[in-house]
Curated annotation (Swiss-Prot):
HAMAP family to which the protein is assigned, alphabetical: ProA (MF_00412)
Pathway info: Amino-acid biosynthesis; L-proline biosynthesis; L-glutamate 5-semialdehyde from L-glutamate: step 2/2
Record's keyword annotation contains Cytoplasm: yes
Gene Ontology CC: cytoplasm
Record-linked Gene3D superfamilies: Aldehyde Dehydrogenase, Chain A, domain 1 (3.40.605.10), Aldehyde Dehydrogenase, Chain A, domain 2 (3.40.309.10)
PANTHER family tied to this protein: DELTA-1-PYRROLINE-5-CARBOXYLATE SYNTHASE (PTHR11063:SF8), GLUTAMATE SEMIALDEHYDE DEHYDROGENASE (PTHR11063)
Family annotation (SUPFAM superfamilies): ALDH-like (SSF53720)
Protein's GO biological process: L-proline biosynthetic process
Recorded superkingdom: Bacteria
Protein name (Swiss-Prot/TrEMBL): Gamma-glutamyl phosphate reductase
Location(s) in or outside the cell: Cytoplasm
Highest classification ranks of the organism: Bacteria, Bacillati, Bacillota, Bacilli, Lactobacillales
Chief localisation class: cytoplasm
Alphabetical list of InterPro entries matching this protein: Ald_DH/histidinol_DH, Ald_DH_C, Ald_DH_N, Aldehyde_DH_dom, G-glutamylP_reductase_CS, Glu-5-SA_DH, GPR_dom
């Protein structure tokens, strides 16, 4: 096993091969990575079967689905890499140019961060997405996968590095930490001088640990306590469609709805319909029904478990939905501000003034009017695959694509000027 220190030194030694690579060279490397990923399908699936067998009974079915790979999912991962090829190279982009009175020409241009560390849980597609985005944005990457997905991740990284071996980019620009203990995560948090940026992707425990302990710069990809508010002026059919999509299409992802707020004028009509759609209809279709966590007012209209205070602060990542009835738009916004993780929140309304109030007052990375929160995604936003959803305001916010993985520098050109 290569030590963490050796890996940090290896990636530092080769980072220039990617930091200054041309767009053509990077695109050739990405295509080679995608091709080798597909070529290694058999090996990746064998590794994934080991991870799935070890995880069965230890994590929920929803989380098992995150971990699971088949040939179609591997092809989708390769397609995601190829889509990054089509994106414009951000490196070298001139952001601003100005000329001073003394003749100095100052150019602000986009540059790579250097080496980016990613700590993430059991999602194999993060491995290929992170490798593709960091490479196209001119960065080397150190990956630290969750233990549940390690065999799969190792097989994926092996394939990606074999792809790089056919190019002029050194394969060591992609590093996988072999130690999946907590100590390896903490070592990355303290790797000042080796990592220029650290991005955690996972649950609240992981993200909080990184934010609280890291001495290297961190972008917080926050958990998603995502709200949908059904206003008194909502179109109910539209609301039901949005709720269904936001909750059931993929409940294990961070942009899935966890809390439903319903105006009291709509509760009696929409909640029974919601119960029919999310419970009875799903049972009849052989699908897992939604389990409700209901406040006292909501429980008058549908059956479910009484909500506890913590239910409105929980990212369930499962077929569970907390429901609260509110008396006004202002109460809905106040609730969101008290409980939101500032990821994605939505209002369903036909009232333009209510929509404007909601979008002005709700301080989240993505705020929706009459649309599902499931659109908070780099691919859906036209950014290609994403590194995560930032819930902070510095240095990036919302879905992080290529530009969010870069910095800038000033190039100052003169003709012998000196400062008086």
């Amino acid at each position: 096993m290569v030590s963490r220190q050796e890996q940090f030194e290896q990636v530092q030694a080769v980072k220039k091969s990617i930091n200054t690579a041309s767009e053509e060279v990077k695109n050739q490397a990405l295509l080679a990575m995608a091709d080798h990923l597909v070529a290694a399908t058999e090996e990746i699936l064998a590794a994934n079967a080991l991870d799935m067998a070890a995880a069965k009974g230890k994590i929920s079915d929803v989380m098992l689905d995150r971990l699971y790979l088949d040939a179609d999912r591997i092809e989708a991962m390769a397609r995601g890499i190829r889509e990054v090829v089509a994106l414009p190279d951000p490196i070298g982009e001139v952001l601003e140019t100005s000329q001073l009175e003394n003749g100095l020409v100052i150019t602000k241009k986009r540059v790579a961060m250097g080496v980016i560390g990613i700590i993430y849980e059991s999602r194999p597609n993060v491995t290929s997405d992170a490798a593709a985005l960091t490479l196209k944005s001119g960065n080397a990457v150190v990956l630290r996968s969750g233990k549940d997905a390690y065999q799969t991740t190792h097989a994926i990284v092996t394939a990606l590095k074999k792809g790089l071996e056919t190019t002029t980019i050194h394969p060591n620009v992609i590093q996988l930490v072999e130690d999946t203990s907590r100590e390896s995560s903490y070592a990355m948090m303290k790797a000042k001088g080796y990592l220029d940026l650290l991005i955690p992707r996972g649950g609240a425990g992981l993200i909080n640990a990184v934010v609280e302990n890291a001495i290297v710069p961190v972008i917080e990809t926050g958990t998603g306590i995502v709200h949908v508010y059904v206003d008194k002026d909502a179109d109910e059919d539209k609301a039901l469609s949005i709720i269904n999509n936001a909750k059931t299409s993929r409940p294990s992802v961070c942009n899935a709805m966890e809390v439903l707020l319903v105006h009291e004028n709509k509760a009696a009509s929409i909640l029974p319909r919601l119960d029919q759609m999310l419970v009875a209809d799903r049972k009849e279709a052989g699908l897992e029904p939604i389990q409700f966590r209901l406040d006292s007012k909501a429980s008058q209209f549908v059956s479910g478990q009484a909500a506890q205070a913590q239910d409105f602060d929980t990212e369930f990542l499962d077929y569970i939905l907390a429901v609260k009835v509110v008396s006004s738009l202002e109460e809905a916004v106040a609730h969101i501000e008290s409980h939101s993780t500032h990821h994605s929140d939505a209002i369903v309304t036909e009232n333009a003034e209510a929509a404007a109030y909601f979008t002005d007052q709700v301080d989240s990375a993505a705020v929706y009017v009459n649309a599902s929160t499931r659109f908070t995604d780099g691919g859906q936003f036209g950014l290609g695959c994403e590194m995560g959803i930032s819930t902070q305001k510095l240095h990036a916010r919302g879905p992080m694509g290529l530009k969010e993985l870069t910095s800038y520098k000033y190039v100052v050109a003169g003709d012998g000027q000196i400062r008086e």
